[in-house]
Amino acid sequence: MSALQAVVTLLLCGQLLAVETGSEAAAGSCPKAPEIANGHVEYSVRYQCDKYYKLRAGNGVYTFNNKQWINKDIGLQLPECEEDVSCPEPPKIKNGYVEYSVRYQCKTYYKLRTCGDGVYTFNSKKQWINKNVGQQLPECEAVCGKPKHPVDQTQRIIGGSLDAKGSLPWQAKMVSHHNLISGATLINERWLLTTAKNLYLGHTSDKKAKDITPTLRLYVGKNQLVEVEKVVLHPDHSKVDIGLIKLREKVPVNDKVMPICLPSKDYVAVDRVGYVSGWGRNENFNFTGHLKYVMLPVADQDKCVKHYEGNNAPKNKTATSPVGVQPILNENTFCVGLSKYQEDTCYGDAGSAFVVHDQEDDTWYAAGILSFDKSCAVAEYGVYVKVTSILDWVRKTIANN
């Protein structure tokens, strides 16, 4: 019977009598049980596994019924023995004792949130204790800014490169009222950043956030539709073009879906390069349906302001915006120029992140969120909301919601 041996048992009015017969067992090999008043005899066998093996399913007891051996859990199916990987009792030592411990580990693309190491020891009070956090159980949170296939930084969304490998897994696509497409950026398993203008696409300015929410469709990864629970607009969104989107459920993090890290320092410096992705219009002003990305440099802010002279420029500026639309330019924004191939972002890319790679910790961070996506290689600069300027509001909003 391989790892199985059988035990013949007689069930007598609820009392179990067993006769071990080694590897063979049959009801006929036992002496006939005496009859009793108001009761009857049932014959059964119990399969047991060899040492270091255990039953995969069922309790191993089979009753003979209608000329068939039946198990109450798995019916006519014979039991199987599998290797028992549970720990045996360790040997004792003189002048010492055994201490049991376990280690909690997170799945791929997740990490321990708590400061402990995940190791818990079973103490004399029958409690599992971690030396750092006591009885508090560890929590696993999503890894951010660590794509499995990062962008090839030697390559160079007007033009741009196709993101076929999921190199920017924080990029989401938002479809608003009247099927207007824009971008959003995943910052944890349940929250995304986008622009306030994106949230108002197809709506009048008097619309409330709760009325906007049901009109949004949001896609992450390979066109995975996720349900929006609510949107939160920045309290000063006319000057800080930002909003937050909360999902109804956490998204599973994998090689196609991963949040971008929020920065702990300012990565905005002139000529520093970063990457922007999106589903915006291409050089023919058509929506391609393919996620593309482009490498762009941070630009000089004074030159950018001069380029877009108008309502937001100093009083001595007189020229008008080259694209006929005035971007928001203030202490909360920064400008990004064209690539050396004259590539740029365009309509539909707003809400996407300007991400930079920190070589010290090999992690990608969101330095900015694209606000002004109408340059389309006609103007020289795109305009981004600086993420460090909104960090306090983002963290407070998430904590309160």
From Swiss-Prot:
Report the residue ranges that make up the Sushi domain in this protein. Answer: 28-83, 85-142
Q: Say which domain of life the source belongs to.
A: Eukaryota
Q: What tissues has this protein been observed in?
A: Expressed by the liver and secreted in plasma.
Record-level Gene Ontology MF annotations: antioxidant activity; hemoglobin binding
Q: Carries keyword ATP-binding?
A: no
Q: Which UniProt keywords apply?
A: Acute phase, Antibiotic, Antimicrobial, Antioxidant, Disulfide bond, Glycoprotein, Hemoglobin-binding, Immunity, Repeat, Secreted, Serine protease homolog, Signal, Sushi
Query: What cellular component GO annotations does this protein have?
Result: blood microparticle
Which SMART domains does the UniProt record give? Tryp_SPc (SM00020)
Q: Which InterPro entries match?
A: Peptidase_S1_PA, Peptidase_S1_PA_chymotrypsin, Peptidase_S1A, Sushi/SCR/CCP_sf, Sushi_SCR_CCP_dom, Trypsin_dom
List all annotated glycosylation positions. N286, N316
Annotated segments matching region Interaction with CD163: 313-318
Disulfide pairs here are: C49-C81, C106-C140, C144-C261, C304-C335, C346-C376
**Where in the cell is the protein located?**
Secreted, Extracellular space
Signal peptide extent: 1-18
**GO biological process terms held by the UniProt record:** acute-phase response; defense response to bacterium; immune system process
Record Gene3D superfamilies: Complement Module, domain 1 (2.10.70.10), Trypsin-like serine proteases (2.40.10.10)
How does the entry describe the domains? The beta chain mediates most of the interactions with both subunits of hemoglobin, while the alpha chain forms the homodimeric interface.
As for family, the record states: Belongs to the peptidase S1 family.
SUBUNIT field: Tetramer of two alpha and two beta chains; disulfide-linked. The hemoglobin/haptoglobin complex is composed of a haptoglobin dimer bound to two hemoglobin alpha-beta dimers. Interacts with CD163. Interacts with ERGIC3.
Q: What does this protein do?
A: As a result of hemolysis, hemoglobin is found to accumulate in the kidney and is secreted in the urine. Haptoglobin captures, and combines with free plasma hemoglobin to allow hepatic recycling of heme iron and to prevent kidney damage. Haptoglobin also acts as an antioxidant, has antibacterial activity and plays a role in modulating many aspects of the acute phase response. Hemoglobin/haptoglobin complexes are rapidly cleared by the macrophage CD163 scavenger receptor expressed on the surface of liver Kupfer cells through an endocytic lysosomal degradation pathway.
The name this protein carries in UniProt is Haptoglobin
Organism, scientific name: Capra ibex
Its lineage opens with: Eukaryota, Metazoa, Chordata, Craniata, Vertebrata
